[in-house]
UniProtKB/Swiss-Prot annotation:
It catalyses: a (3S)-3-hydroxyacyl-CoA + NAD(+) = a 3-oxoacyl-CoA + NADH + H(+); a (3S)-3-hydroxyacyl-CoA = a (2E)-enoyl-CoA + H2O; a 4-saturated-(3S)-3-hydroxyacyl-CoA = a (3E)-enoyl-CoA + H2O; (3S)-3-hydroxybutanoyl-CoA = (3R)-3-hydroxybutanoyl-CoA. This is Fatty acid oxidation complex subunit alpha. GO terms for cellular component: fatty acid beta-oxidation multienzyme complex. The keyword Lipid metabolism applies. NAD(+) binds at M325, D344, V401, V402, E403, K408, S430, N454. In the N-terminal section; belongs to the enoyl-CoA hydratase/isomerase family. Induction: By palmitic acid. One of its GO terms (biological process) is fatty acid beta-oxidation. It comes from the Bacteria. Residues 312-715 are annotated as: 3-hydroxyacyl-CoA dehydrogenase.
Amino acid sequence: MIYEGKAITVTALESGIVELKFDLKGESVNKFNRLTLNELRQAVDAIKADASVKGVIVSSGKDVFIVGADITEFVENFKLPDAELIAGNLEANKIFSDFEDLNVPTVAAINGIALGGGLEMCLAADFRVMADSAKIGLPEVKLGIYPGFGGTVRLPRLIGVDNAVEWIASGKENRAEDALKVSAVDAVVTADKLGAAALDLIKRAISGELDYKAKRQPKLEKLKLNAIEQMMAFETAKGFVAGQAGPNYPAPVEAIKTIQKAANFGRDKALEVEAAGFAKLAKTSASNCLIGLFLNDQELKKKAKVYDKIAKDVKQAAVLGAGIMGGGIAYQSASKGTPILMKDINEHGIEQGLAEAAKLLVGRVDKGRMTPAKMAEVLNGIRPTLSYGDFGNVDLVVEAVVENPKVKQAVLAEVENHVREDAILASNTSTISISLLAKALKRPENFVGMHFFNPVHMMPLVEVIRGEKSSDLAVATTVAYAKKMGKNPIVVNDCPGFLVNRVLFPYFGGFAKLVSAGVDFVRIDKVMEKFGWPMGPAYLMDVVGIDTGHHGRDVMAEGFPDRMKDDRRSAIDALYEAKRLGQKNGKGFYAYEADKKGKQKKLVDSSVLEVLKPIVYEQRDVTDEDIINWMMIPLCLETVRCLEDGIVETAAEADMGLVYGIGFPLFRGGALRYIDSIGVAEFVALADQYAELGALYHPTAKLREMAKNGQSFFG
């Protein structure tokens, strides 16, 4: 044993060849934390000091290679002054450079996922051999930063600027065959032959058959592009990537600028350029919010794992109510491996549900994401039925009938008589109280809410709603089933609107107030889209459906009359009464017509102004900043109330619910992190400036206390 640590070992294999193996004790994956970096330094020094070493193979003792840096540790460094952050980064980079400079050939054997620092470790090796099932990539831009362990320096010198820019700016994971095409790796083999292939490569390099020094040299030098080639490559890339990323995500363009600034430098000077740019990005609001979301997501995954311990396995599911929603749920279940019965009361509903599932499957086949054989297998996993005959074997039933409490209660009571006593019933309701629906059941402990968002195949969130009598087993089993379907479940307690709709309707309330104050809804949409929302509130209301919004608004007003009830008619009333229901019937705030591909195209329709005229009660002069505040303050304050009321347990769950459920701007991190970014005291003062708009704008006593004590939602 040449070196033995808790994360890394270096052992002799044969004939002077050693294996540097990453295998972090007590963890399921390898990652670069302080311990691993320190041990890599010691391991490299030990190899350097051993004159008998003739070659090094880098490997992993886990199913993955290295997933990247331990962001929970490194995020603390981001708070350091720039000079300290840069110095620390360069110190870490010296380890990778010293490994690269070893006076013997090196081969990285990539057995599984190698991301971020994991791939950067591989780039420092002379040769890379990759299992055909592995994936590699530099996903740092998704955290608002860019690669900081030499990725912006080595990758463009290995695979060319255009390819490197695509990899770094997109943050995508790349399959083995694609990595081989651009020469990011030297060979691809089946996983069982990886060790032998790495050994063969290192022997050929030791013998001189492969010139490892020549292979290494381009990574140490400046880029092989003249001034004109550089200008064409970088300026074109910056323009394209800036258009794709938008102004709120600076990391992709900064990465290109860094590669450009370092183009005429050798490795060590180029690494200094990388470190300076990395420190700049680490201080941005976008990186703070995006890293916060990543950490929130990790917290959610940990919570979901706790439920796994008591959950029952759902081997057979059922959905009640076919149609588009039922078909979407059936598709999602069957495509992820859980067969599902799809029941409706008539053939038309069944046909609609099957058509929806088939449409989604055909779309995947057309895009090359699924084989026709797999499509047939998924369709066979959806069994349509008009009766309860086969429900005796069902583990979990999702009720997805019309959003009416009496209808839902009747259907749930009926199905309860046809399933096993331990079967779980879940209602896909967006607003109706789970505890109210449970009153119709003999076994309310087996009943929960399971709120899918539309369209089911695209929206990642599922709210699992715990009613007053819902058992831990029912909640856990539903969470596990949602995960199995490829969704991100969040457990919420019962209340009108649960989490997402309870928070969304105050946002719509702010929008309604603006329209009634004479503000053009097209302008409001533009301002909120610029703020970062995927679509403005008028367009979103059209997509949701004016009738759906009208019903939801009434449910929320009944549940929270002190702040959500408005006796005046609003824009949604005017459109609903005029039967302008949004995209579903071609007219809402906007008009819609299908383009050549059948996609709904949004058009400005001046006739809506006459419809809205009676609900415009004044003409206020508001700034764009006012528009943002009228919209965002009620949304943020309702999120605070949800946390205070225990509807969600943690700030992380609240923020992730809004990101996954309604497309809250990623770079702003969620409603509670948005408050933190302003400052709790400053946000309370801001809300007080709009207090005359009503109770939705009034901070809670607890929030005022937080402001007074200088507290925040995230440390």
